[in-house]
A protein has these predicted regions:
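Glyoxalase I/VOC metalloenzyme domain signal
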Residues: 1-40, 51-95, 111-245, 256-274
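Ferredoxin-like iron-sulfur electron-transfer modules
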Residues: 100
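Short, small/polar residue-rich loop motifs at catalytic or cofactor-binding pockets
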Residues: 103-105, 250-252
Length: 274
Protein backbone atom coordinates (compact mmCIF):
# COMPACT_ATOMS: atom_id res chain seq x y z
CA UNK A 1 0.00 0.00 0.00
CA UNK A 2 1.02 3.62 -0.58
CA UNK A 3 1.54 6.30 2.07
CA UNK A 4 -0.75 8.56 0.02
CA UNK A 5 -4.08 9.14 1.84
CA UNK A 6 -7.02 7.21 0.44
CA UNK A 7 -9.43 9.52 -1.40
CA UNK A 8 -12.81 8.75 -2.90
CA UNK A 9 -14.14 9.86 -6.29
CA UNK A 10 -17.82 10.68 -6.76
CA UNK A 11 -20.05 7.63 -6.35
CA UNK A 12 -17.70 5.57 -4.19
CA UNK A 13 -18.85 4.63 -0.67
CA UNK A 14 -16.32 6.39 1.55
CA UNK A 15 -17.27 6.19 5.23
CA UNK A 16 -19.37 4.35 7.78
CA UNK A 17 -20.64 5.27 11.21
CA UNK A 18 -23.12 3.90 13.68
CA UNK A 19 -25.69 5.83 15.73
CA UNK A 20 -26.08 4.30 19.19
CA UNK A 21 -28.22 5.17 22.25
CA UNK A 22 -25.14 4.55 24.43
CA UNK A 23 -22.03 5.46 22.41
CA UNK A 24 -19.62 4.56 25.22
CA UNK A 25 -21.07 1.05 25.51
CA UNK A 26 -20.89 0.70 21.73
CA UNK A 27 -17.23 1.77 21.81
CA UNK A 28 -16.49 -0.97 24.34
CA UNK A 29 -18.27 -3.56 22.18
CA UNK A 30 -16.67 -2.62 18.86
CA UNK A 31 -13.31 -1.91 20.46
CA UNK A 32 -13.06 -5.46 21.75
CA UNK A 33 -14.60 -7.04 18.65
CA UNK A 34 -12.45 -5.28 16.03
CA UNK A 35 -9.54 -3.79 17.96
CA UNK A 36 -10.68 -0.21 17.40
CA UNK A 37 -9.36 2.68 19.49
CA UNK A 38 -11.45 5.83 19.84
CA UNK A 39 -10.97 9.58 19.98
CA UNK A 40 -13.64 12.29 20.09
CA UNK A 41 -13.58 14.46 16.96
CA UNK A 42 -16.43 16.75 18.06
CA UNK A 43 -15.71 20.33 19.20
CA UNK A 44 -16.17 21.21 22.90
CA UNK A 45 -19.82 21.29 23.91
CA UNK A 46 -21.02 19.30 20.87
CA UNK A 47 -22.34 15.72 21.00
CA UNK A 48 -19.50 13.21 20.87
CA UNK A 49 -18.41 11.80 17.53
CA UNK A 50 -16.02 8.95 18.31
CA UNK A 51 -13.60 8.19 15.50
CA UNK A 52 -12.54 4.54 15.51
CA UNK A 53 -8.92 3.97 14.51
CA UNK A 54 -7.33 0.68 13.52
CA UNK A 55 -3.53 0.65 13.58
CA UNK A 56 -3.71 4.44 13.67
CA UNK A 57 -5.93 4.76 10.57
CA UNK A 58 -9.52 6.05 10.56
CA UNK A 59 -11.87 3.07 10.24
CA UNK A 60 -15.39 4.16 11.28
CA UNK A 61 -17.18 6.27 13.89
CA UNK A 62 -19.79 6.12 16.64
CA UNK A 63 -22.34 8.87 17.32
CA UNK A 64 -25.29 9.23 19.67
CA UNK A 65 -28.66 8.27 18.20
CA UNK A 66 -32.09 6.88 19.09
CA UNK A 67 -33.10 3.25 19.47
CA UNK A 68 -32.70 1.01 17.64
CA UNK A 69 -29.07 1.63 16.78
CA UNK A 70 -28.11 1.63 13.10
CA UNK A 71 -25.15 1.65 10.74
CA UNK A 72 -24.87 4.35 8.05
CA UNK A 73 -23.00 4.31 4.75
CA UNK A 74 -21.68 7.54 3.21
CA UNK A 75 -21.16 7.93 -0.54
CA UNK A 76 -18.64 10.45 -1.83
CA UNK A 77 -19.92 13.35 -3.92
CA UNK A 78 -18.22 16.40 -5.37
CA UNK A 79 -21.08 18.72 -4.38
CA UNK A 80 -23.52 17.66 -1.65
CA UNK A 81 -26.12 20.29 -2.55
CA UNK A 82 -26.18 19.26 -6.20
CA UNK A 83 -26.27 15.56 -5.24
CA UNK A 84 -29.32 16.19 -3.05
CA UNK A 85 -31.10 17.85 -5.97
CA UNK A 86 -30.21 14.95 -8.24
CA UNK A 87 -31.41 12.45 -5.63
CA UNK A 88 -34.83 14.12 -5.52
CA UNK A 89 -34.98 14.35 -9.32
CA UNK A 90 -34.28 10.60 -9.56
CA UNK A 91 -37.16 9.77 -7.20
CA UNK A 92 -35.28 9.57 -3.90
CA UNK A 93 -36.12 11.33 -0.63
CA UNK A 94 -34.18 14.00 1.24
CA UNK A 95 -34.22 13.13 4.95
CA UNK A 96 -31.83 15.85 6.13
CA UNK A 97 -30.59 18.71 3.93
CA UNK A 98 -26.90 19.41 3.36
CA UNK A 99 -25.06 20.71 6.41
CA UNK A 100 -21.44 21.38 7.22
CA UNK A 101 -19.69 18.98 9.59
CA UNK A 102 -17.19 21.63 10.60
CA UNK A 103 -14.05 21.57 8.47
CA UNK A 104 -14.36 17.79 7.99
CA UNK A 105 -16.85 18.06 5.13
CA UNK A 106 -20.49 18.55 4.17
CA UNK A 107 -23.14 15.87 4.52
CA UNK A 108 -26.79 15.09 3.82
CA UNK A 109 -29.11 12.18 4.58
CA UNK A 110 -31.18 10.71 1.76
CA UNK A 111 -33.06 7.55 0.79
CA UNK A 112 -33.54 5.77 -2.50
CA UNK A 113 -37.08 5.24 -3.90
CA UNK A 114 -37.33 1.89 -2.07
CA UNK A 115 -36.53 3.49 1.29
CA UNK A 116 -32.90 2.46 1.73
CA UNK A 117 -31.24 5.32 3.63
CA UNK A 118 -27.69 6.49 3.01
CA UNK A 119 -25.58 9.58 3.50
CA UNK A 120 -23.80 11.85 1.05
CA UNK A 121 -20.31 13.11 1.87
CA UNK A 122 -18.52 16.06 0.29
CA UNK A 123 -15.04 15.78 1.73
CA UNK A 124 -13.24 18.60 3.46
CA UNK A 125 -10.43 17.65 5.81
CA UNK A 126 -11.73 14.09 6.19
CA UNK A 127 -11.84 12.24 2.85
CA UNK A 128 -13.17 9.00 4.34
CA UNK A 129 -11.99 5.67 5.71
CA UNK A 130 -8.24 5.07 5.65
CA UNK A 131 -8.39 1.54 7.10
CA UNK A 132 -10.14 -0.71 4.59
CA UNK A 133 -10.08 -4.35 3.50
CA UNK A 134 -8.04 -5.85 6.31
CA UNK A 135 -9.23 -7.62 9.48
CA UNK A 136 -11.13 -5.21 11.69
CA UNK A 137 -11.64 -2.72 8.86
CA UNK A 138 -14.56 -1.91 6.58
CA UNK A 139 -14.75 -4.16 3.55
CA UNK A 140 -17.79 -3.04 1.54
CA UNK A 141 -21.27 -1.67 1.99
CA UNK A 142 -23.92 -3.55 0.04
CA UNK A 143 -27.39 -2.45 -1.02
CA UNK A 144 -30.22 -4.91 -0.44
CA UNK A 145 -33.07 -3.87 -2.71
CA UNK A 146 -36.69 -4.99 -3.00
CA UNK A 147 -36.47 -4.35 -6.77
CA UNK A 148 -32.92 -4.69 -8.06
CA UNK A 149 -33.79 -3.50 -11.57
CA UNK A 150 -35.27 -0.25 -10.27
CA UNK A 151 -32.39 0.15 -7.81
CA UNK A 152 -29.86 -0.23 -10.62
CA UNK A 153 -31.62 2.48 -12.60
CA UNK A 154 -31.70 4.89 -9.64
CA UNK A 155 -28.06 4.52 -8.63
CA UNK A 156 -26.82 4.54 -12.21
CA UNK A 157 -28.64 7.82 -12.79
CA UNK A 158 -27.30 9.30 -9.55
CA UNK A 159 -23.72 8.01 -9.52
CA UNK A 160 -23.02 6.46 -12.92
CA UNK A 161 -22.61 2.98 -11.45
CA UNK A 162 -22.10 -0.08 -13.61
CA UNK A 163 -22.74 -3.68 -12.59
CA UNK A 164 -20.72 -6.88 -12.92
CA UNK A 165 -22.83 -10.04 -12.89
CA UNK A 166 -20.57 -12.81 -11.59
CA UNK A 167 -23.17 -15.57 -11.50
CA UNK A 168 -22.44 -16.40 -7.86
CA UNK A 169 -24.36 -15.76 -4.66
CA UNK A 170 -24.80 -12.01 -5.15
CA UNK A 171 -27.11 -10.34 -7.63
CA UNK A 172 -24.36 -8.10 -9.00
CA UNK A 173 -21.20 -6.26 -8.02
CA UNK A 174 -21.33 -2.45 -8.10
CA UNK A 175 -18.52 -0.78 -10.04
CA UNK A 176 -17.49 2.85 -10.42
CA UNK A 177 -15.75 3.16 -13.81
CA UNK A 178 -12.18 4.35 -13.39
CA UNK A 179 -11.98 3.69 -9.65
CA UNK A 180 -9.26 1.09 -10.10
CA UNK A 181 -7.21 3.61 -12.07
CA UNK A 182 -7.67 6.12 -9.25
CA UNK A 183 -6.52 3.62 -6.62
CA UNK A 184 -3.54 2.52 -8.70
CA UNK A 185 -2.43 6.15 -9.07
CA UNK A 186 -2.90 7.00 -5.38
CA UNK A 187 -3.38 4.78 -2.33
CA UNK A 188 -3.14 1.28 -3.84
CA UNK A 189 -0.53 1.06 -6.65
CA UNK A 190 -0.47 -2.77 -6.49
CA UNK A 191 -4.23 -3.24 -6.86
CA UNK A 192 -4.12 -4.90 -10.28
CA UNK A 193 -1.19 -7.12 -9.35
CA UNK A 194 -2.95 -8.21 -6.17
CA UNK A 195 -6.23 -8.90 -8.00
CA UNK A 196 -4.64 -10.70 -10.95
CA UNK A 197 -7.00 -13.68 -10.64
CA UNK A 198 -10.17 -11.64 -10.14
CA UNK A 199 -12.86 -11.18 -12.81
CA UNK A 200 -12.31 -8.44 -15.38
CA UNK A 201 -13.22 -5.01 -14.02
CA UNK A 202 -13.06 -6.11 -10.39
CA UNK A 203 -10.64 -3.29 -9.55
CA UNK A 204 -13.57 -0.87 -10.02
CA UNK A 205 -15.87 -2.74 -7.59
CA UNK A 206 -17.14 -0.77 -4.59
CA UNK A 207 -19.94 -3.00 -3.26
CA UNK A 208 -22.69 -5.43 -4.18
CA UNK A 209 -26.41 -5.33 -4.86
CA UNK A 210 -28.65 -8.14 -3.65
CA UNK A 211 -32.39 -8.77 -3.61
CA UNK A 212 -34.07 -8.67 -0.22
CA UNK A 213 -35.62 -11.86 1.10
CA UNK A 214 -38.38 -12.83 3.50
CA UNK A 215 -40.09 -9.46 3.78
CA UNK A 216 -36.82 -7.69 4.51
CA UNK A 217 -36.92 -3.93 3.91
CA UNK A 218 -34.53 -2.27 1.48
CA UNK A 219 -31.39 -1.11 3.25
CA UNK A 220 -27.66 -0.57 3.08
CA UNK A 221 -25.61 -3.21 4.90
CA UNK A 222 -22.11 -2.56 6.27
CA UNK A 223 -19.62 -5.41 5.86
CA UNK A 224 -16.48 -5.54 8.05
CA UNK A 225 -13.50 -7.83 7.43
CA UNK A 226 -12.38 -10.36 10.04
CA UNK A 227 -9.55 -12.89 10.11
CA UNK A 228 -11.71 -15.69 11.55
CA UNK A 229 -15.49 -15.68 11.25
CA UNK A 230 -16.05 -18.33 13.92
CA UNK A 231 -13.85 -16.56 16.47
CA UNK A 232 -15.45 -13.18 15.73
CA UNK A 233 -18.94 -14.65 16.06
CA UNK A 234 -18.02 -16.13 19.43
CA UNK A 235 -16.59 -12.81 20.63
CA UNK A 236 -19.66 -10.89 19.45
CA UNK A 237 -21.98 -13.30 21.26
CA UNK A 238 -19.90 -13.12 24.45
CA UNK A 239 -20.25 -9.33 24.31
CA UNK A 240 -24.04 -9.53 24.01
CA UNK A 241 -24.62 -9.53 20.25
CA UNK A 242 -26.82 -11.92 18.28
CA UNK A 243 -25.76 -13.93 15.23
CA UNK A 244 -28.67 -13.67 12.79
CA UNK A 245 -27.42 -15.78 9.87
CA UNK A 246 -24.32 -17.19 8.21
CA UNK A 247 -23.54 -17.55 4.52
CA UNK A 248 -20.63 -19.42 2.92
CA UNK A 249 -19.86 -17.73 -0.40
CA UNK A 250 -17.23 -18.44 -3.03
CA UNK A 251 -14.91 -15.65 -1.87
CA UNK A 252 -16.03 -15.13 1.73
CA UNK A 253 -17.52 -16.61 4.88
CA UNK A 254 -20.19 -14.18 6.11
CA UNK A 255 -22.22 -13.70 9.26
CA UNK A 256 -24.98 -11.17 9.91
CA UNK A 257 -24.74 -9.74 13.44
CA UNK A 258 -27.04 -7.58 15.59
CA UNK A 259 -25.07 -5.63 18.18
CA UNK A 260 -26.32 -5.23 21.79
CA UNK A 261 -28.13 -1.97 20.95
CA UNK A 262 -29.77 -3.26 17.76
CA UNK A 263 -27.49 -2.17 14.89
CA UNK A 264 -27.06 -4.86 12.25
CA UNK A 265 -23.90 -5.44 10.22
CA UNK A 266 -22.04 -8.26 8.48
CA UNK A 267 -18.63 -9.74 9.17
CA UNK A 268 -16.65 -11.24 6.29
CA UNK A 269 -13.72 -13.67 6.34
CA UNK A 270 -11.96 -13.72 2.97
CA UNK A 271 -11.14 -17.12 1.51
CA UNK A 272 -9.55 -18.24 -1.73
CA UNK A 273 -11.96 -20.16 -3.98
CA UNK A 274 -11.40 -23.91 -3.97
Amino acid sequence: MSDIPRTYPQGVPCWIDTEQPDPEAAARFYGELFGWEFSNAAPPGAPAYLIAALDGADAAAIAAGPEPARWNTYIAVDDADEAVRQTADAGGSVLAPPADAGPAGRTASVADPQGAEFRLWQAGRRPGAQAVNWPGAWNFSDIRATDTVAARDFYTRLFGWRYLDLGESVESMIAVPGYGDHLEATADPQIRERQAGAPEGFEDVVGAMEATAGGERAHWRVKISVADRAASMATAQRLGATVLATDDQVWALLADIRDPQGAEFTISEFREPA
